Amino acid sequence: MKPSKLLLPLFFVLAIATACKTNTLTGKKTLNFFGDNKPLFAMSLKQYETFLSQHEVVRGTENARLVSRIGKDIAKAAKTYFSYKGQPNLLDEYDWEYHLVKRDQVNAWCMPGGKIVFYTGIMGIADNPDGIAAIMGHEVAHALADHGAQRMSMGILQQAGGMITAEVSKNQDDRNRERIMMAYGIGTTVGGMLPFSRKHVTEADKIGLELMTIAGYKPEEAPKLWERMKAQSKGGQPEFLSTHPVKKGVLQT
């Protein structure tokens, strides 16, 4: 094997080591290639504006006003939350936006930098202001904990790992090469991404409950919300739950 090929895994390991940073919110070491929020926030803003330009934004309705009002309450709670932690200026770069979009899917999300969208399809399941606050707190928690940056970093890592795997296996016979690539594919799906997602959901559940409580909403509505979400799926899986794997215990939280 050529020396250049031997160096590839070394560079790979060094990249991981330098990208492991302490998460401000959780205090845990996480993989994050985006040390500065500005590039990530700029990318999020561009994608957010593109999304809104391609979908019907609902304005002037009671639900639209609720999403905006509760979003502001949760954003204010987030600032209070970080003030408790001695970091009152941590969210100064956030430029919060809250929109209700006409889509039947049961979904809501918050991009890095505070760009929030609720779909009309989730409003019936939210059912009341406390239910909206539970969803809002959960999605904002994902953004505050840098889950978007971590997911993107994991994607970069997997792409780089795939390139290394292909390079290392290039001179193997076809059968061995196929085995290596298959093993890599299974490893990234089962051993990396899915547990990572559940970890994020658990963190967002905890932080989201704190945010909605600080904002003056009833945290006991959260498990009722997840029960309604589960019942609505009727054996299927709404888009929200497909991107938010939920353990059974969460429903009794």
Predicted segments with their positions:
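A Zn2+-metalloprotease active-site environment signal
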Residues: 5-8, 20-253
